[in-house]
Amino acid sequence: DNGIKTHTESLKESINYFTNNLEIDTVNPSSDSNIFEKVKDLDKYDGLIWGGSSLNIYSDTIEIRKQIDFMRECQKRVKNILAICWGLQVAVTAAGGEVKQGTNGAHRGIAHEIIINSEGLKHLLYKDKKQIFNTPAFNYDEVVTLPAGSTLLSSNKVNKVMGLNFKSELSDIWGIQ
């Protein structure tokens, strides 16, 4: 143990802060060769959290296509998805939206002055959150086309889409960049 936690370990620790009464399975759709065997019964899950990555969706590698395919399957069978950063980009792409390299710069460490819009102020994702806030972030890409029926929740000068809610198949997807 070198003392550095993976993104997955940090997410688990954060969730366990609120409750340890959860059964959490971890998969990597890019490298798990039997991904659908490992999670045969996606229907049993109450939710899914899809975290960050340094990949770019438009690179269109086999590893990225595997993730998009797996997300499509999750959207058919998992009711609640929290899509964080890369997870948002995969969820949007799987649902017919589009992600491209950002044209207004990048977030390198902190995303500044995220503004929650009127729809976001009503959404549980931002319950009790200040209307303008900063948050840790590393991203070079942005959602440029929203999936059908999406509700934009927040934006900043770098990314128009910082918070998003949409439904795809069975899933209610809450996404944050």
What are these regions (language model features)?
Residues 1-79:
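N-terminal beta1-alpha1 cap of cysteine-dependent amidohydrolase-like domains
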Residues 9-13, 89, 140:
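Active-site phosphate/pyrophosphate- and oxyanion-stabilizing loops and adjacent acidic/basic residues
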Residues 4, 60, 84, 145-146:
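Alpha-helix N-cap/helix-start motif
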Residues 36, 59-61, 92-94, 147, ...:
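Short glycine-/acidic-enriched loop or helix-start segments at secondary-structure transitions
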Residues 53-120, 134:
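Cysteine-nucleophile active-site neighborhood
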Residues 2, 6, 89, 159-160:
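Short alpha-helical
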Residues 26, 82-84, 175:
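A structural signal for short, well-ordered beta-strand segments and their strand-loop junctions
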Residues 97-177:
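Pocket-forming structural segment of enzyme catalytic cores
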